[in-house]
């Protein structure tokens, strides 16, 4: 499929571009610099079948992102990206993460159907619980074995414990603290590590997750 990005330079308010069948819209002024070609290169990392659910990447000041303290979110065929972030590396990282969430729509059975990924995730949660207890942190077992997203647990990880402190605790267990949030975030965090960071550490610590990503590539 033909790509239509021909402009060079940074994304600006009012831009409406198309690349690899994805419409890129800049709704509001960006408080960071993002080169158009850098964004195009990230999109081109993926086989077309992996990005087929994404019709739009929209940059702007979105209430629903701000209220939930999200930098980006995938919803109904679009990736919404906050216009207020620290830099383009973080923005591109977030976009790849949300592409990971979009993949669940088409490949949910491949990723989750056999239950192997969920078992790997729960096992890691239990290992993390051991590390928490060493630090005097107690979380009810029913929360730690629940693979679904729990906003209270998310906030406890990010705000009460804090990701800087959690980073040391998850070493050798999760790729990053955010991967411990829920099963779906575990997958998207690994997707981001595999495609964007190209980090072989993921294969070492999360063999089931890595094998799912390899299988995904083979089927895309």
Which residues are covered by each model-predicted region?
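Zinc-dependent metalloendopeptidases
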Residues: 73-74, 79, 106, 119-124, ...
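Pan-zinc metallopeptidase signature
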Residues: 150-220
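Auxiliary, metal-adjacent structural segments of Zn-dependent hydrolase domains
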Residues: 8-88, 113, 131-144
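Short alpha-helical catalytic segment bearing the HExxH-like zincin motif
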Residues: 90-98
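Non-catalytic architectural context of zinc metalloproteases
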Residues: 1-30, 57-63, 92, 158-171, ...
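A generic secondary-structure signal for well-formed alpha-helical elements
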Residues: 50, 103-107, 195, 199
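Catalytic Zn2+-binding segment of zinc metalloproteases
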Residues: 99-119
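Low-complexity, serine/threonine/proline-enriched polar segments
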Residues: 117, 121-165
